[in-house]
Each structure stands twice: as structure tokens, then as C-alpha cells.
Amino acid sequence: MTSPTVAVVMCTYNGEKYLRQQLDSILAQTYPIQELIVQDDCSTDATLAILQEYEAKVPFIQVIENTHNLGFNLNFKTACMRATADLIAISDQDDVWMPEKIQKQVQAIGDYNLCFSAHLRGERMETAHIVSSQYAPEALLFAGIAGHTMLVRREFLQREEIWVDKFFYDWSIAVGAYLYDHRGIVKVDEPLNWHRSHENEAALKQNLDLFPQSKKKPTYQPYLYGFRNYRRLQQKPNWKRFYTFVREHSDPSLYPLLHQMATLMLKNDVISLLKLCRLCMKHRQTIYPVKEKAQGIRGMIRGFFYPFIFSYRCSTFDLKLEFNL
């Protein structure tokens, strides 16, 4: 049996500061890379020059320069469509991969649509904390899986229908991994890359712009302001689009909890909200983002109020993310 081929897809925009370190960590992988596709979204710094330098030295690197700015969502979609290998690994421009990242994910993916891993997150690798996401179908109603941790089957990733328009690409891919072909997701529960948190991070900037008053270490705020934001988000077109997509594409016989919860999140009455809270409390071990915090009485309280905790600083449904050219 032949080993599957792997493509790495990276999208760049003004990433000169950390780009070399990330490229070097990809080139140092213990598993062979068939193609490294890097698509630059009209950078104004030295990013393109760095990419062209690597392209001249490494035969399997292909650099594409966009003629106009696409934004990160459409940039990743169009870049992924260029890949020809069996499996596609998604890469940010400012991470660092562990040498065995691809090898361990190739060994784990089996017949699944998607394999992801835990990762390190922080300003410095030495002080970074481990992020290990939940990935049950119902957990993906509240939070996606980081794209930079993903290894995805190409025939699945290049299906047009998994790219939910105006929504974060990696979140829609994760949900689609269950809804299409029903192959689902597998996890390597060890950190295989370091994801930098720094002042230029796009998601961080967007969050601070939308919630300038939010607390770094909140206490009561998620319970109070989270409810208000939950009701506000329910009116957003992106909210309705995403949860309608999940409800319409989830088979109730295969994913009854996912289907039921997506339906409740589309309803505005108090009874539906209480039912949703009760389900979150009951299934908190597979839904709440940090398993350790879902234990005991406090865990039950967190589980019940998780729709509000999730909504407290949720900017996903406020953003305008296009997939159309």
C-alpha cells in the first residue's frame, strides 16, 4: 500500500516577521511534502520577496500572488482548490510546526475526513499553554477547530458545499467533516504546532474592536452580558445561515443531539433557550471547551450557562467573510 501524498497550503499577508521560521519548520518535516502552495494576498511588506527566495531554492514550493485582496477566507479556499495531493495540511504564516506533525497526523487520519491536533498557544513557545479542543458534533455548534492544526482529505476539502459562505472557513470545514460522507474527525491529543498570539493577529484585533469593554479574566460578565449578546447574535444573518445549514444537513437519525440543538438555536422563545441550556449542562463533558472545568457543581453551572459564556465575546457572526469572487 502506497503512502498518501501531502500538500501544505499556506496563505500570507504582511507576514515577513515570522514567515521564515514557519517555512523552515515545514521543510523540516519528517514526512515528505509533495507540494507547498503559498498564496499571498497582496502583501505590502517583504513577504512576497521571502516567498520567492524559498521558491527559487525548493522545487515543490509554488507561490501565487493574488491580483487583488481576497481576504483570508476566500484566499484559503482558492489556495486549497489548487492542491493535487491526497491530503492537505493547512498552515498559518506565523506558526512553528513540530518536526513530526505531518507524520503523526498521516498515521492517525485513517478513513476520517479530518485529523487535527492539540497545539501550543502563546507569545513564546516556552510559556505557551496547550489548547486541546472538543470535537464532538454538538461541540462544533459553539466553536470550530483551528485550521492550522488540520490535515484534511483532499476529495472532501475540495467539495464546494462544505465552504459555508460568510463564515470562518475552518469552522465550516470541521462541521462539514461530520455532515458529508459521515467520516467525521479524529484527534491527535498532543501539541504538534505552536500558534503565536501577538498584537498583529487578525482575530485578536477584530475581537477587541467589537468588544473593547470585555475583561481579560471575566467573572460574572459572561453570564450577564452573554445573554444579551446571545439574543443580539440570533438576529444576525450569519447566525441564521450557519445554524440553518447545520439543521438542514444533519441527519436526525445519525446526529440527533446536533440536529436538536441547531434547531433550538434558531428559535427565539424562552422555552427553547432553557431546553438548549439544559442540553448543554447534560452533555457538558463533550461540549464545554475545557473538560476539566465541566466537573462538579461549578461544571454543571458552567454547562447550563454555556450558550451565554459562548456568546460573551463571540465575534464570528458579526464579521463579513466572503467566499465569492
Positions of PLM-derived features:
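Glycine-rich, basic loop-to-helix element that forms the pyrophosphate-binding segment
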Residues: N66-A83
